[in-house]
Amino acid sequence: MPSRDFPRTVLLLLLILATACGGGSSPTAPTATPTGQQTSTPTATTLTLTGTVTNIITGATISGGVIEVGGETATSGADGAYSLTITASSTQSFSASASGYYTRQSSVSMTGTSVVNLQLIPNGDGFNLTLFDHLFREKGQKGTKRWTSQPTFEIWTQEFTCLETNSNGEACIKYQAKGTAPTIFETNVRNSIAKMGQLTGSALSGSPITTKTHSVGTTLTHNDWGTTVGTISFAYVTGLYGENNAGASGDPNNKIHIDYGANVYADQTIHLHEVAHAVGFRHPDGSNNMPQPGIMGPWPYQWTSADERLGRILYLRPTGSLTPDIDPTGTIIN
């Protein structure tokens, strides 16, 4: 029988149909949907916040203050008192505002305490936000830094010679113990420490003061100083360290060290300036470029009521506080 030629198109169609039929393969079973799995919903909690709203500087009660938590609001009365009930299942945003005051922003825990007394910062009454941000927030660019526990003040009884300085000569990076430091050095350190309660709203009153004597020839390095975390140490330094130099290095809640040169160790105002650095004060543009005179500058340094007022507020707010009055992430006000 003569062969029959099928057109190529027909052969291709037959091949496609055979493939589509699957050649007798078993069908794939549909994927089973899990049963019995339920998404848990957090249980809502009801919390009634109560308290009094006052001026952080004068202590006067604030009428008409608006407290807002998670969309719910309450207003303080003539006596500054407020009450606000919230029902929610998680941490809620919090704010407290009033005419003539900076708005306080934080968070509320639905399982926290129910009494929250609020101290708002006035736009006035001796508070200067520009100065506060300059002193404590790198001109408003960063959060504050302050001690959250009592530091230990450690006075070194030896004179230290500086064997090596940093590139600009302003800081000693290698020290060696010599003989006894002048008596007036320890006296001035103790006198400056005694003022720290005034500069921190009494937060750092009563911090322990110790002395440390190093064996002659002991060598120490910058950013270690042989001290423990939580220590503010003081040294009388000669050698390569500038006679007119004084400086504090380190960070609150870690360790801080202060050096005093041969021409400045007897100057009480310089001691106060450096200890103010140790508790959180700064001069980001240098001591001769301050918004107004005070303990940070310009020279000659002046201890002012503004320093005391703003230092107290620094320690009434959590470390990391942002301008104008925003608690750092994770802060719970109750």
Label for each model-derived stretch:
Residues 60-63, 68-85:
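Short, acidic Ser/Thr/Gly-rich low-complexity loop/linker segments typical of extracellular
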Residues 178, 182-289:
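Metzincin-family zinc-dependent endopeptidase catalytic domain
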Residues 252-266, 282-334:
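Metalloprotease/metallohydrolase-associated module, dominated by Zn2+-dependent proteases
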